[in-house]
Structure formats: C-alpha cells, structure tokens
Amino acid sequence: MPTRTHKLFLILLLLCVLPYTTLAQEPDTTGGIPTGADVQPETPVDEWTGKTVLVVGAHPDDDSYAYGTLSLLRENDNEIHVLIMTTGNVGTKDPDMTRTRLSQIRREEELAALSALGIPEDHYINLGYTDGMLEFADKKEVVKQLVYHIRTLQPDVLFAFDPGYGYQAWHKTDHRSASYLAADAARAAEWRLLFPGQINHEGLDAHRIEEYMFFGGPDEAKNVTVDISGAHAENKVQAISKHLSQFSSAWRDYTPELPPDERETYMQNIRERALDSTEAGQPVERFRYYEGIPDGIGKRRGEY
C-alpha cells in the first residue's frame, strides 16, 4: 500500500508532467505558419498617425499589395517611404525592349503610382539590382544598404513580404530573397557593432523596428484587416493602373499610352485586381501583423 509520502510524490510528478502531455497532444493546425492571430496592434492601423513607415519590396509594383493601406496612412499624417531592391528591368515579353529602357519605364511608373497615393518622389529608394538576380547578389552588401536606410529613416513600421512561411521557399526568386533580406536587415540594424562604420563615421544610430506588416502570405496567417473603402480604394486602383508595362498589352508590345479600345477593359481588370479582397462587401487589405524583436518574426505562437 502506498505511503503518504509516495502519494505526495505521485501527485507532484503528475503536476510536472501533465502540462507537457497536454501541449504534446494539442494538434498543430498551422502547418508551420506563424499565426499570432491573437496579436493586434495596440492602436488600430486606421488610427495610426505620426508614424514613419518603410515598405520594402523586390520590384517596382510590389508595394501594390499595400497601396490602399498606404493611402490611408498617408492621409493620416504618417510618413511613407518605399524601398525597392531591383529596377524591374527584366519583366517584359516585348522582344524589342532593353533592360536600360525598361528600368527607366518602371521607375517612371512607380513614381506615378506613388504620386497617386500622395507619396513624394524623394521618398522612393531603388537599390538598382537586376531583376531576377537578387538571390545571386552579395547578401552582405544588400543587407548593409538596407540597414543604412533603416538607420537613416528610423521607421516605426516595416511592410515587407512575409518571410515566415513555407510558400516563400518556392515563390518567385526575388520575392523570396526580398523577404529574407528585409528580415535580416531589420535584425542587423539594431546592433551597433554590425556595420559600425554607419554609426562611428556616418553619424547614424542603431535602430529597432517595433512593428511589422507582412504581405503576400496565406490567408490563415493574416491577423489584421484594413478597410480601404472609399477614396483609398480608388487611389489604389489609380496607382496600380500606372504600371502599364506589367498589367496591359504593353507587357508584350510596349507603348506608353494604351490603345483606345483597350482602356476601358484595362481599367476594369485593374479594378478587379486591386479590390479582389473584400469583407462585408467592402474592399480590404490583409496582413500578418507582428510586434516585437526581429528574431521572433517567423515563430509560431508559443515557440521559444
């Protein structure tokens, strides 16, 4: 017969083991996706004001995932900066197009799109890398440049491709690279002994980005929905429409102006593309919001 001491020992053992048994039996339905569905911004995104926002993408037009939200943030007196890593100088099927010409076209299209959102030209940064070749670039140099701009702008919020899920491993090479490079730069920017010359010789300060808005991920990973109805939806449509070289017949045979018989169809297609995500009949944009240290960007809830 067990003694009282034995009973106490068994009870203590059960108390120690039971929590781990419960956790082990809890099914993982995320498929490795960082969820964080219970994490929300302390202040709703549509009430943000006075923040500095940095959007990082691979190509001119990658920021279109967030055009509606950027329009809203700009109206609410937030400062928006857009950093694109490549010139987009390969994205065409036009046999007569050259890299140099397409690079200039895509710069002009991006600036026109940003203007439609109220974002000034001097808030646009392009690192100048060749489209499709980002993963072969010197990673240290790319991260160094990104860190420089993070330390210069001191952003409160980073918008970027979501690096924290399996889809990126198989997606378009530049998007995959941009997602990881942005995360690596956010991590490096806060450590003063990484790229110390920027601090010791260029007068910059180390900087930690506190909030992240990731786009391009699966719906089940997204935890923030931004209502872009009204003027912001229309601004998004107009901004995306500026990328003629990517979304019209100019993709195969570039002309700076659409043929008259294509204009109506083009704008209809752009509108459908821009406003394809809705909630309660209203256009929205969805993101995976994360707040905290960069090392936790890709962790699932409860991981350490």
Describe the predicted segments one by one:
Residues P2, L10, A24-V53, K140-Y304:
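Metal-dependent de-N-acetylase/amidase catalytic core
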Residues F9-P19:
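Bacterial N-terminal signal peptides
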Residues A24-L153:
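Active-site rim/loop-helix segments in enzyme catalytic domains that contact anionic ligands
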